[in-house]
Amino acid sequence: MATRLFTSESVTEGHPDKIADQVSDSILDAMLKDDPKSRVAVETMITTGQVHVAGEVTTKTYVDIASVVRERILEIGYDSSKKGFDGASCGVSVSIGSQSPDIAQGVDTAHEARVEGSTEDDLDRQGAGDQGLMFGFACDETPELMPLPIALAHRLARRLSAVRKDGQVGYLRPDGKTQVTIEYEDGKPVRLDTVVVSSQHAADIDLDTLLAPDVAEYVVEPELALLEISTEGRRLLVNPTGRFEIGGPMGDAGLTGRKIIVDTYGGYARHGGGAFSGKDPSKVDRSAAYAMRWVAKNVVAAGLASRCEVQVAYAIGKAHPVGLFVETFGTGKVPDAQIQDAVTQVFDLRPAAIVRDLDLLRPIYAQTAAYGHFGRPELDFTWEATSRADALTAAVKG
């Protein structure tokens, strides 16, 4: 019997890196709302009293970026200098240029149309916005077909934020982190080993008599009651440093794109390295990673495997992927090559087809920027749909 421990973490919406992600995606949404064909690549850096926004944008609309920044930060909960940051009074600097015409050329007129003479299919006209490799993953450990460690870490982080916002534990502040360690036997989750919760809090809050008991009662225990695995002997560590009064941008500078493992599968699956937030769907870093999750989830939903990881790769300016790889880690009901062939029959992985099939030219991205881009049953993400599972099964059967 092979036993191992696996750990994943999540962070709340008030973590400085997540503030940056949400600001970048809020700016993206504001542009897509009025001009769905906007090209956007926006990075945010946030530190004590300051927010810096930079990037490249081509759009027909006007967005008051400073107002978008302030509104998002205030919604997160940083609305007072007593909390270490105030969205209403912080400094906001903006440095935005236009998208490089060299990049635009490859996206607007793909290599297939420009060089290879393929003009009959409109989907061949849009090239990938960059080269790169993207991964998607799904497994049957949870109803949402996500790995249990990251799924539970996200649930705890969402609840930590919820009890702050609804006043149940009103002395909490927006910055927080959760971490979950699960024991596996023969590849299956069997026991919760350790939970770590760190939360920023108001001054003069006693850890042992107030904070730790409140976190246990209102955050941790309600989630553990829903688990189907053993919690016997589990450890709970709350604010292990002893104090967490200084948090958010005052405690650490935040940057867009620094929580790519939290955004995806908690380290349980491979990652191509590209961040998501602040990027419109012409950037395959984002859209193709969403598509790979869609593919992998449909493979598992179809019962073709209990674990599935899919890699796709693109060349900048080309519409068709240059590589596709399906791996089921020995859990496939048929050979991986057969599943891969079925994927190519059922899914069109050209960038324009992904944007069309997943309806990505919409202002939907700010809600993805905290608590994970995948496995969100409370949100209606198109890449979480399993409506192509039957088609995959039929394609495998031939």
UniProtKB/Swiss-Prot annotation:
Disulfide bonds: none annotated. ATP binds at H15, D175, G176, K177, R243, F244, D252, R258, K259, A275, K279. It catalyses: L-methionine + ATP + H2O = S-adenosyl-L-methionine + phosphate + diphosphate. It is found in: Cytoplasm. It is an enzyme of class 2 (transferase). Its main location: cytoplasm. Keywords: ATP-binding, Cytoplasm, Magnesium, Metal-binding, Nucleotide-binding, One-carbon metabolism, Potassium, Transferase. Mg(2+) binds at D17. L-methionine binds at E56, Q99, D252, K283. GO terms for molecular function: ATP binding; magnesium ion binding; methionine adenosyltransferase activity. One of its GO terms (cellular component) is cytoplasm. It holds the Pfam family S-AdoMet_synt_M. Pathway: Amino-acid biosynthesis; S-adenosyl-L-methionine biosynthesis; S-adenosyl-L-methionine from L-methionine: step 1/1. K(+) binds at E43. One of its GO terms (biological process) is one-carbon metabolic process. It comes from the Bacteria. Its cofactor is Mg(2+); K(+). HAMAP family: S_AdoMet_synth1. Belongs to the AdoMet synthase family. Homotetramer; dimer of dimers. Catalyzes the formation of S-adenosylmethionine (AdoMet) from methionine and ATP. The overall synthetic reaction is composed of two sequential steps, AdoMet formation and the subsequent tripolyphosphate hydrolysis which occurs prior to release of AdoMet from the enzyme. This is S-adenosylmethionine synthase. The lineage of its organism: Bacteria, Bacillati, Actinomycetota, Actinomycetes, Frankiales.
